[in-house]
Amino acid sequence: DGGQAQFIERSVPTDYESDRLGPLLDHMRKHLHQEHRIPDLARRAGMSERTFLRRFSEATGKTPAKWLLNVRLCEARDHLETSDISIERIAEHTGFGTPTNLRHHFREQMGTTPTAYRQTFGRISA
């Protein structure tokens, strides 16, 4: 582990306030626990699916799925560092659904398990 937290880039679109995607990104962040399907996101943004995918990628540098995974991982990491919420609840709250899914994606991105990360970087003794 080395005792150093791994960096997860926090994707922020260019011209966030003026961009039509800003409110949509806020909505997605506030509803991480929900499924976000491309047709629904495009409709919410008032765009065709093709235009939505192009604009989303231009604004964030990622596909919606990769952006959402990144945001979910950042939120999970924040919970692990600052709370004693169970891994199960973190998985539900951040949209991973199950602890197994959270562990898989967390290990893939961070190189460690959520439990080991919490033991190393957590600020609250669980």
Q: What role is predicted for each listed range?
A:
Residues 1-7, 16, 20-37, 56, ...:
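Basic, amphipathic alpha-helical hairpins
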Residues 2-6, 66, 116:
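Short, polar/charged, Gly/Pro-enriched helix-capping and turn/loop motifs at alpha-helix termini
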Residues 4, 42, 51-54, 91:
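Short acidic/polar alpha-helix capping motifs at helix-coil junctions
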Residues 10-11:
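Anionic-ligand binding region
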Residues 26, 35-40, 47, 57-99, ...:
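Terminal helix-turn-helix DNA-binding modules in bacterial transcription factors
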Residues 62-64, 111-114:
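Short, solvent-exposed alpha-helical "recognition" segments
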